[in-house]
Every structure is written in structure tokens, then in C-alpha cells.
Regions:
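Residues at alpha-helix caps and immediate loop-helix transition turns in enzyme cores, especially N-
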Residues: 33, 85, 111, 147-148
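Short glycine-/small-residue-rich flexible loop motifs, especially phosphate/cofactor-binding loops
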Residues: 42, 119, 223
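A general structural motif
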Residues: 68, 130-132, 157-159
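Acidic/His- and Gly-rich active-site-bordering loop/insert found
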Residues: 2-103, 124-129
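Midchain, well-structured core segments that form catalytic/ion-binding scaffolds
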Residues: 142, 146-240
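General beta-strand structural signal in soluble alpha/beta enzymes
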Residues: 53-56, 102, 135-137, 162-164
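Alpha-helical metal-binding/catalytic segments enriched in His/Glu/Asp
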Residues: 73, 94-142, 180-186, 206-217, ...
Length: 240
């Protein structure tokens, strides 16, 4: 089968994946690393004899063919912060029990790199298609997709497109994400002095904590709230 051609590049692909994972490409925090990840993909495309182009500060594409309809494959190279609870190095490739581990392997660096290698496999096989394939790469998907908004101000919309940014099965929609700012009035006896729950709104934090300064401390009420909720809770308090 033609699809098996990708297996010829397995070792080379895994080596490149390790390099791609090494970039701590958190948009808004590590913009230079986002640049490095995008430049790496475009450089590898050049190595393979493909046509790559940096289109905006946060996007680029690799094109195969120049006729017919334009088919886009959209992937992203940015990741959410890794957090502190990894059992393996998050920014390196680890193979364990038949699985690959590293921040971004599933979302979406693995698919981004496989897309590049699929174009390489097609090119090396001498396939002459009647349509144009374009792999589109962004580095701001996790922070609102401003990368694609700006990309399509300068580049045409594909006639057809998909993104390999999901588990197996074809999806045409995704659940939404609602970002809220909540404010409330506290009584004079209680002050919310600290509240921390990770570094990204679209990732489950490994740890969250709140600090209250209160002269009306009710341990039993807090215990009942904890028992009614999911997760593990730990209470530390001092009494003046």
C-alpha cells in the first residue's frame, strides 16, 4: 500500500520529533521557541526538496503541487505549559511500553511532523497529482488562533481542508471553551489573598490552591465542600 511508504522514514521521523519536542513553544511565554519550532519544520521541508514559506510571524506553509484545487492540512506547533508533575522529561521524546511521551506529541507536534513526512513520501514516490496540497503550520492555536486569523488575511482559504488534531474518527465540530472572569463580594471577615490554578486556561492544572485570610474560619464547612467535590484536598492553616 502507498500509505506504508511513511514507515520507510520511521527512524528519521522519530529523530526529528525529538528535536521538535525540545522547543518549549508556549505561545506568549516562549515566543522565540515558537519561532524555532516553525523554522525547524520549514528547514526540514527545504531539506526534502519541498517548497516552504514563512508567511507571518506565527505561521508558515509547505506546498506540493501548483494546479487544481487547494487542499489544506492545518496543524500547530505551539503547546500548553508542561506543568510540574511529569514522570519523564516533557520536552524530550521518551518511548516507554510501546508509547511515546513528550509535551505536544498528540497535540499537535506529532501530527505536524507526520504531515511533512507524508508530503515527502508523495514527492519521493513521483506522484503527480491534479490538485495542490498545502500543509499550514501555526504557533498560536492554544491561545486563541490569532495565527490563523492573520494567516488567512494574506493567503487564500483552501477549497477543502482538515486538521489531524484529534483522536481517530472524523469530527466536524469541537466543544467550546468559555473563559470567565468571576468577581464576588466577600464579607469583612474574609480576604482572598492568593488563587493559583496553572498557567493556561485550556489545560487541567496539576495543582490548584487558594489562600484565605479569615477571622471567621470554619473547618467543618470546608471539609464538607471538599467531600462533595472531586479531587484531593489538603488544608493548612494557622491561627493568630
Amino acid at each position: 500500500m502507498f500509505g506504508n511508504k511513511i514507515l520507510d522514514f520511521k527512524d528519521e521521523l522519530l529523530k526529528d520529533l525529538n528535536t521538535l519536542l525540545s522547543f518549549e513553544s508556549v505561545d506568549g511565554e516562549k515566543n522565540d521557541e515558537c519561532d524555532n519550532a516553525l523554522n525547524f519544520i520549514l528547514k526540514r521541508a527545504e531539506d526534502f526538496g519541498l517548497t516552504g514559506e514563512r508567511t507571518t510571524d506565527k505561521s508558515g506553509h509547505i506546498t506540493f503541487g501548483d494546479s487544481g484545487k487547494l487542499c489544506g492540512v492545518l496543524t500547530h506547533l505551539d503547546v500548553v505549559p508542561a506543568g510540574n508533575s511529569w514522570s519523564v522529561p516533557p520536552y524530550a521524546l521518551t518511548e516507554k511500553d510501546g508509547r511515546l511521551y513528550g509535551r505536544g506529541i498528540a497535540d499537535d507536534k506529532g501530527a505536524a511532523l507526520v504531515t511533512l513526512y507524508c508530503l515527502k513520501a508523495i514527492k519521493d514516490s513521483g506522484v503527480k497529482g491534479v490538485n495542490t496540497l498545502r500543509a499550514i503550520y501555526g504557533t498560536g492555536e492554544e491561545t486563541g488562533m490569532e495565527d490563523m486569523e492573520n494567516y488567512f488575511k494574506k493567503n487564500p482559504l483552501p477549497d477543502m481542508a482538515f486538521t489531524p488534531d484529534s483522536d481517530y474518527g472524523i469530527c466536524f465540530a469541537e466543544k467550546g471553551i468559555l473563559q470567565l472572569e468571576v468577581s464576588t463580594l466577600l464579607n469583612n471577615a474574609t480576604t482572598l489573598s492568593q488563587f493559583h490554578a496553572g498557567r493556561a486556561v485550556n489545560a487541567v492544572p496539576d495543582r490548584a490552591y487558594v489562600m484565605l485570610d479569615s477571622s471567621d474560619y470554619d473547618e467543618q464547612t470546608l471539609m464538607r465542600l471538599a467531600d462533595a467535590s472531586d479531587g484531593d484536598f489538603e488544608f493548612n492553616y494557622t491561627i493568630d
